């Protein structure tokens, strides 16, 4: 395959995604095929987002790293020193992707490191490794193209996370604002009693201790449940099982109590 055909192969993989999230494993496999190298897509914290192996490396530490999907912390931190594509790093470098304890087995091992940037910040690193053959300009063009695609995908995921967090917070705030003063007081006592995100409570006991009617507690729980903030289930004489579904709820409740 020439460079154009290889680029088209990456494009075909992207078009197949058709607006859906790009699978980092598929991206790594496509780059592995067109560049003919081992490919590792690593997050800024060393998490292995995707990888594909062209030449198997028989080393226990490497096998464990792939199973755990986590690069060593020290190595991950060092990667931040590389701010532009660094091709054909040999086995003696601290940046080599080959196991240094087996240098003799991988004397011809070469590593190429491509920073993944986006939105003005470092998002991760694309690491390529292979034996015997140097990475040429065509390989580097494909690697940098791949790193750009991965960077855009990481940014999209981050934007979705921020959006989801804002949505969760808004739902909680609306649910809490729908509670009357006595219902809010009841909810505060309920979650003091639970001491966590789920558990059993006996509504009548709380009602007696706080000095409110049981119906106030029932109404408060119903409002939170209809908003999707909690789920509750009656267990008869044992009481009511409650579980928090929205992780922003307890934080917002704590803010109200301390304000």
UniProtKB/Swiss-Prot annotation:
The modification Phosphoserine is found at residue 215. The keyword Cell membrane does not apply. Keywords: Cytoplasm, DNA-binding, Phosphoprotein, Repressor, Transcription, Transcription regulation. GO terms for biological process: negative regulation of DNA-templated transcription. Residues 1-155 are annotated as: GAF domain. Residues 203-222 bind DNA. SUPFAM superfamilies: Winged helix' DNA-binding domain (SSF46785). It is found in: Cytoplasm. GO terms for molecular function: DNA binding; DNA-binding transcription factor activity; GTP binding. Pfam families: CodY (PF06018), HTH_CodY (PF08222). GO terms for cellular component: cytoplasm. The keyword ATP-binding does not apply. HAMAP family: HTH_type_CodY. DNA-binding global transcriptional regulator which is involved in the adaptive response to starvation and acts by directly or indirectly controlling the expression of numerous genes in response to nutrient availability. During rapid exponential growth, CodY is highly active and represses genes whose products allow adaptation to nutrient depletion. Belongs to the CodY family. This is Global transcriptional regulator CodY.
